[in-house]
């Protein structure tokens, strides 16, 4: 889980509300780059499948639409006291995920602390950092890059 401000100078989560399903979140570590894709926003199975089939492999798209991740939304607005979003698999099941999920958390609406905006994404790939830097990554929309010092 990552939490950050979305307003003010240098706010890393300023554009979090513009994320769409399948947008990339990149985590650059010392030796690897992890690419996460934002999960579907809808809670309807058919819509979740159509939103995820364009970016995930077929097995993951099925898990996202009707399987173990069917109740994990890619975008959610919650109140500050809804601490269950900190759970590794925030669907109320108490299960541990067997695929990596990432949660981004910030204040909502902008310039307010009344609610929290939550974005969730599933791990898409882990690549050698040197090889990753040699190629161009296509972008289908907004994305987020987080680097390790």
Tell me what each language-model feature is.
Residues 1-149:
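Extracytoplasmic/periplasmic soluble domains downstream of a signal peptide or transmembrane helix
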């Amino acid at each position: 889980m990552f939490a950050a401000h979305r307003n003010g100078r240098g706010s890393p989560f300023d554009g979090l509300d513009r994320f769409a399903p399948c947008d990339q979140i990149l985590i650059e570590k010392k030796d690897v780059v992890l690419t996460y894709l934002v999960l579907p926003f809808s809670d309807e199975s058919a819509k979740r499948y159509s939103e995820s089939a364009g970016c995930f492999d077929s097995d993951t798209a099925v898990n996202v639409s009707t399987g173990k991740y069917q109740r994990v939304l890619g975008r959610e607005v919650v109140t500050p006291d809804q601490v269950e979003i900190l759970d590794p698999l925030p669907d109320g099941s108490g299960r541990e995920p067997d695929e990596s999920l990432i949660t981004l958390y910030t204040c909502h609406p902008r310039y307010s602390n009344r609610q929290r905006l939550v974005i969730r994404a599933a791990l898409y790939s882990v690549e050698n950092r040197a090889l990753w830097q040699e190629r161009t990554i296509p972008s289908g929309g907004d994305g987020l890059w987080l680097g390790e010092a």
